[in-house]
Each structure stands twice: as structure tokens, then as C-alpha cells.
UniProtKB/Swiss-Prot annotation:
GO molecular function: 3'-5'-RNA exonuclease activity; magnesium ion binding; polyribonucleotide nucleotidyltransferase activity; RNA binding
Domain S1 motif: from-to ranges: 626-694
The UniProt record lists the keyword Flavoprotein: no
Taxonomy of the source species: Bacteria, Bacillati, Bacillota, Bacilli, Bacillales
Record has Nucleotidyltransferase as a keyword: yes
This protein's name: Polyribonucleotide nucleotidyltransferase
Any matching Pfam family: KH_1
Binding site for Mg(2+): 490, 496
NCBIfam families reported in the protein's UniProt record: polynuc_phos, PRK11824.1
EC code(s) of this entry: 2.7.7.8
Required cofactor names: Mg(2+)
Keyword set, alphabetical order: Cytoplasm, Magnesium, Metal-binding, Nucleotidyltransferase, RNA-binding, Transferase
């Protein structure tokens, strides 16, 4: 990498974009500093000197949010950054996906991309800056990379598309789209949307691609200026004679019939047996452990299986389980299968099954998100778990990984637009989707199961959501789009394009591909085929439950809303929170108070809610002119007595208002602790209350 500092500038969505090379992190294979507005990201690319064994490309993308970038000190005892949060993990995945397909086939060196956010401007996305930084770090390095790529964020407001919308614009946008690609095609899409049409989504994707092309041209100018010398990489050549011999054996032993097996586990077992039979043909009795030969035979066999699966789909239009390209697997769904939970839905599609379980909580049960932006209170959460047994495997049980975090977030994005507002449904909602069986499209099964759970719980959702995953097999001059892909089609195909939405439109999409990019024609056709599949699944789900239940579970907390004057909030809270804690301790409820005076009281028992409400009403109660009260004498003065009307409110009973008869001394008729009926005659501008007993005698 060049050791001389160089600075390159352009404009991006009305803000300055600067890329600097040659000054920082000079021992990395490639490093750039990206300045976008006041956002600053350091992106580095490093590769190992030797390749790794295995049949996968060991690429790792990291995205680190440094709290100092937003002028914050991390929370917790250690006061330093820990493991990446969910948002950072999702950003790392977002960057990985458009970059991964652009490395040479067969390249097995470890490659690590590091993105450090050094300064964060909320209106200048650090995520998009990191994507450009990752592309540039690879492009100016000696690592072989067929980029550059770029990514942009697209919003949709009042019928107009916007590149990299500000925080305020995102609040009113119907679309939150991240799209990435190179100059010729789109190769990554991620979006959440408020029921936009397929055509609107298509236009948004290619509106974003126009800006991507400009950014790629800018990066290419930098590469042409720096002229990095790339590592020489020569892919290993296949022994064609060996390939032909193995191919002949696979045909002889019935590879086609083995692939065309309905049951996933039976197919896997049959393929393993076929491979073992063929490998045994090559084992030399004098050298039975020739590992290099055995590895090569297995590698060729795996490639031949892939070629056969793709040939069957592309030429014969038949899939491994016998389906047609646009056919959906058998569907089954149930609700209310767990008696003590607040809502549950079981969704099964072929050999993929998800159990989604919903829990309702008080508003105070929200998740607090403390990242580089302002603190955020999240009242809807969707979590996804993928245990080993779901694919018939064993292994250690670990905390959720990148895949589980990503699938959970996709489901959350698909469903959040149908969740009712706090005013209509004052609850925190958490859904956990447990994948019990998996043969592809488990994330979309979790979305369908979650919709069932929401309706079973009685959540008044705006509309049901269903999800489906689309696949693709390309040939030189043709392509085949697949509806509802299974595991083998995902692994051996060219695309995993997930689409979720209501009957009216799309609420989320996510596209991953293994080829260079997709044309407008393919994306348009995939979206339309997904729409038809989504509606078919939706119709099945609505046969199980067609609308949310009218009542919540008996085990769900009840939430009652009441309103007080904003200036009374301090009375309910009390000094240092003393009063509100007393209410919570006495009644066992959860209290959430908004700045406008709205109070949410939550508890399982209605009696607890009623008692808490009574206490709050007593605290915030106000005297009214003309009302009568049974008052208690609290203090006596020469000019009258101060009486308590109710907790927190006293009134002056002047000596002239005690009786219609003349009184010389207050003590002649009243003493502290006496009860006397009074009528409120006046409340002055300072809120002081005057009362009269005499008015009741006349």
C-alpha cells in the first residue's frame, strides 16, 4: 500500500465525502479513512500469508462503534466497550454480503475487514461510510478483489425517493432501504417498509443503484491513481481425467435418483453412501490413507452434486424434492398450543418448523438501546433461536451468533410496521421464535409463526404478515427463479431473496447472492413471484386464525391508562421517587408516566390496578368550588382554622365562616382532629382554597 498520504473528495447526497490513504494503519494490506460529513470511519483490510484448508472462504467483517465517537462514556462497571451490540453485528453482516461474492473463486486466505467508527454524525450514516471504506480498503490493497462496490440508504417520502435520509426524514419515511452493488448490477438489498408495492420497491432499488454507480466511479478513479499491485492468485486446476472418471461413476450409481429424494435426511444419507462408494473405488490398498486424493475426490463429488442439482432445476424444471419452480411446500399451522403463555403460533412448511411465543409486558419493560445515537426505548422485540437439534446435529449451546441476531432482526423489521401504537395498545411485546426443524427458509417461518402468535395473543395488529424465501439458478443464457427454497437449493443456488409483507405490500426484504449481481429483470420477476407465494401462505394462515382475538390471555398483564395534569407528575413521583415507589410497593403494579401526564398502570390482578389508581387519584385530586367535603381540623389560628379536605390539600376556614352565630375564639367550637363539613367558596390565583361551614347552615 502507498505510504504517502493522499486525499480524494467528492459530494454524496449533499454532503462532503473524503477518502484518505497512506497515513493511518500502514501495516495493514489496505487502509482508508472515510470522512462523510462529521462521520469518520477507519477501514482496514488484512489477509493471511497462507491459505486455509477447507471448502469455504474465511472472510470476517467487523464493525466497531467506539462510544467516544458520539462523546459518550460506556456504561457498566468497566466503562469500556465490550462485545459488539446487535446493531454493530447487523452492520458487519450488511457489509459482508455485497463484498463476499467478489473474491476469486477458490481464494482461501483469511481476510479480515475492520471498521472503526471514530466520529459519528447521526445524519451521515457511519454504516454506509463503513461499507465504502471496506470496499476502498480492499481495492487499494494487494488482496485480489473484483470491486469496488458501494452502498446507499434510500428513503421514500411523499412519493419521492431520497438518498441517505436524515434522522428526521427517516421518522416519516415509508421505506428504510439499504442497497449495495457494483457498477453493473445490484448484489445486496435489505429493507423495512410500510406496505409499499413491488413496483415502488423495484424503483427504489434502482434509484439507489444510480448513486452507487457514481460512487463506484469515484472509487475506481482512486484505484487508478494509486495503482495497487495485486497478489497473483491462480486457482487450482481440476484433473479433468479424474473428473470424467468420477462423473461416469456417479451416473452409473444413479446420482440423479439420489438427488431426487423427497426427505432431506434420507437424501443426505443416500448422498453420503454414494460418495463413500465412489471414494472406495480410488483407495489404493498400498496407500489406503492417501488424504490428498480422498480430499480431491470428495471435492469433485460435491461439485458434481451441485452441477446435477442445478441442471435438474434449469433444464428439467424439477427440484430435489420433486416440486415445480413456483411450488410451495406443504403448509400447516396452529395457535394457542401453550396454555400459560400470552400467545403462541406453530408454523410448519415442509421440513421447516418454527414455534413463536409471545409475551406481553408493561411499557416499562422496554429494551433500552444505548448506541452512538440518542437513547432509544424499544417496545417490540423479536428474537430467533436455532438449536442444533433442528438440523439433527449435536454441538455446544452458545449465546446467539451473527446468524441468529440477523434473522431475529429481519423478523422484527417485517413485523414492526403492523404493531399498534402505544395509545392503542400500551404494552411491550416480545416474541421468541424457536426453530424446531429446519430445511431452509426458517427466518420466514419465524415471521409467519410470529404473526399467528400476535393474533392468538389478541394484539390488534394492522394486518397479518407472511414471509417467503426465493432462490435462483442461472445459466449462461437463462435463469430459473424458485419459490420457497429448501436448504440444498439455498446452499447450491445463486440467491436467497427473502420477502415479507401483508396483502397490501412489502414490509421487509433481504437479498443475498453468490454471483456478481442481479439485473432489473430478475429482481422484478422475483418480487412478483414472491408476492404470489406470500399471498398463498397468507390465505393458509388466515384459515387457522383470521383476526386477532378480542380478549387477552388470562395470564397476560392488564394495563389501564389514566391522565393527570402534567404539573401533578412531581406529586405522584415524590422527592427522589419516594411516592411512586410507595405506590408500587403497596399495590405491586408497574407504573409508567409520560411527560404529557398519561399514566400506564399494569398488573395481572385488576384489584391491584384499581388500588393504585385510587392512590393516584387521591394524590392528584383537586378541590372544586361549590363541592362539600368532610374536612379534618389540622391547625388553629386566631383568624380561623386550617382543615384538610383530602391528602395533600388544605383549606382555610375563616372564623367568620365557622358558624352563622358570632364566635369570639375558634377554640370555643373547634379543636385539632375534629371533623367538620365544609363547602368550597373560593380558589384564588395562587391555588389557595377558602372554605365555609356557615354556608351550609344558611
Amino acid at each position: 500500500m502507498s505510504q504517502e498520504k493522499k486525499v480524494f473528495k467528492t459530494e454524496w447526497a449533499g454532503r462532503s465525502l473524503t477518502i484518505e490513504t497512506g497515513q493511518l494503519a500502514k501495516q495493514a494490506n489496505g487502509a482508508v479513512l472515510v470522512r462523510y460529513g462529521d462521520t469518520v470511519v477507519l477501514s482496514t483490510a488484512t489477509a493471511s500469508k497462507e491459505p486455509r484448508d477447507g471448502d469455504f472462504f474465511p472472510l470476517t467483517v467487523n464493525y466497531e462503534e467506539k462510544m467516544y465517537a458520539a462523546g459518550k462514556i460506556p456504561g457498566g462497571f468497566k466503562k469500556r466497550e465490550g462485545r459488539p451490540g446487535d446493531d454493530a453485528t447487523l452492520t458487519a453482516r450488511l457489509i459482508d454480503r455485497p463484498i463476499r461474492p467478489l473474491f476469486p473463486k477458490g481464494y482461501k486466505h483469511d481476510v479480515q475487514i475492520m471498521n472503526m467508527v471514530l466520529s459519528a454524525d447521526p445524519d451521515c450514516s457511519p454504516q454506509m461510510a463503513a461499507m465504502i471504506g471496506s470496499s476502498m480498503a480492499l481495492s487499494v490493497s494487494d488482496i485480489p478483489f473484483q470491486g469496488p462496490i458501494a452502498g446507499v440508504n434510500v428513503g421514500y417520502i411523499d412519493g419521492k425517493y431520497i438518498i441517505n435520509p436524515t434522522v428526521e426524514e427517516k421518522e416519516v419515511s415509508r421505506l428504510d432501504l439499504e442497497v449495495a452493488g457494483h457498477k453493473d448490477a445490484v448484489n445486496m438489498v435489505e429493507a423495512g417498509a410500510s406496505e409499499i408495492t413491488e413496483q415502488e420497491m423495484l424503483e427504489a432499488i434502482f434509484f439507489g443503484h444510480e448513486e452507487i454507480q457514481r460512487l463506484v466511479d469515484f472509487q475506481q478513479q482512486i484505484v487508478d491513481h494509486i495503482q495497487p499491485v495485486k497478489q497473483e492468485f491462480i486457482p487450482a486446476e481440476r484433473d479433468e481425467a479424474l473428473v470424467e472418471r468420477i462423473k461416469s461413476l456417479t451416473e452409473e450409481k444413479g446420482l440423479k435418483e439420489t438427488v431426487l429424494t423427497f426427505d432431506k435426511q434420507q437424501r443426505d444419507e443416500n448422498l453420503d453412501n454414494l460418495k463413500e462408494e465412489i471414494v472406495n473405488e480410488f483407495i489404493d490398498e498400498e496407500d489406503p490413507e492417501n488424504e490428498l486424493l480422498i480430499k480431491e475426490v470428495y471435492a469433485i463429488l460435491n461439485e458434481l452434486v451441485k452441477e446435477e442439482v442445478r441442471r435438474l432445476i434449469a433444464d428439467e424444471k424439477i427440484r430435489p424434492d420433486g416440486r415445480k419452480p413456483d411450488e410451495i411446500r406443504q403448509l400447516d399451522s396452529e395457535v394457542g398450543i401453550l396454555p400459560r403463555t400470552h400467545g403462541s403460533g406453530l408454523f410448519t412448511r415442509g421440513q421447516t418448523q418454527a414455534l413463536s411465543v409471545l409475551t406481553l409486558g408493561a411499557l416499562g419493560d422496554y429494551q433500552l438501546i444505548d448506541g452512538l445515537g440518542p437513547e432509544e426505548e424499544k417496545r417490540f422485540m423479536h428474537h430467533y433461536n436455532f438449536p442444533n437439534f433442528s438440523v439433527g446435529e449435536t454441538g455446544p449451546v452458545r449465546a446467539p451468533g451473527r446468524r441468529e441476531i440477523g434473522h431475529g432482526a429481519l423478523g422484527e423489521r417485517a413485523l414492526k410496521y403492523i404493531i399498534p401504537d402505544t395509545a392503542d395498545f400500551p404494552y411491550t411485546i416480545r416474541i421468541v421464535s424457536e426453530v424446531l426443524e429446519s430445511n431452509g427458509s426458517s427466518s420466514q417461518a419465524s415471521i409467519c409463526g410470529s404473526t399467528l402468535a400476535l393474533m392468538d395473543a389478541g394484539v390488534p395488529i394492522k394486518a397479518p404478515v407472511a414471509g417467503i424465501a426465493m432462490g435462483l439458478v442461472t445459466r449462461e443464457d437463462s435463469y430459473t427463479i424458485l419459490t420457497d427454497i429448501q436448504g440444498m437449493e439455498d446452499a447450491l443456488g445463486d440467491m436467497d431473496f427473502k420477502v415479507a409483507g401483508t396483502k397490501e405490500g412489502i414490509t421487509a426484504i433481504q437479498m443475498d447472492i453468490k454471483i456478481d449481481g442481479l439485473t432489473r429483470e430478475i429482481i422484478e420477476e422475483a418480487l412478483e413471484q414472491a408476492r404470489r407465494g406470500r399471498l398463498e401462505i397468507m390465505n393458509h394462515m388466515l384459515q387457522t386464525i383470521d383476526q386477532p382475538r378480542t380478549e387477552l390471555s388470562a395470564y397476560a398483564p392488564k394495563v389501564v391508562t389514566m391522565t393527570i395534569k402534567p404539573d401533578k407528575i412531581r406529586d405522584v413521583i415524590g422527592p427522589g421517587g419516594k411516592k411512586i415507589n410507595e405506590i408500587i410497593d403497596e399495590t405491586g403494579v408497574k407504573l409508567d408516566i409520560e411527560q404529557d401526564g398519561t399514566i400506564f398502570i399494569g398488573a395481572v390482578d385488576q384489584a391491584m390496578i384499581n388500588r393504585a389508581r385510587e392512590i393516584i387519584e387521591e394524590i392528584t385530586r383537586e378541590a372544586e368550588v361549590g363541592q362539600t367535603y368532610q374536612a379534618t381540623v389540622k391547625r388553629i389560628e386566631k383568624y380561623g382554622a386550617f382543615v384538610g379536605l383530602f391528602p395533600g390539600k388544605d383549606a382555610l376556614l375563616h372564623i367568620s365562616q365557622i358558624s352563622k352565630n358570632r364566635i369570639e375564639k375558634v377554640e370555643d367550637v373547634l379543636k385539632i382532629g375534629d371533623t367538620i363539613e365544609v363547602k368550597i367558596t373560593e380558589i384564588d390565583k395562587q391555588g389557595r382554597v377558602n372554605a365555609s361551614h356557615r354556608a351550609l347552615e344558611e
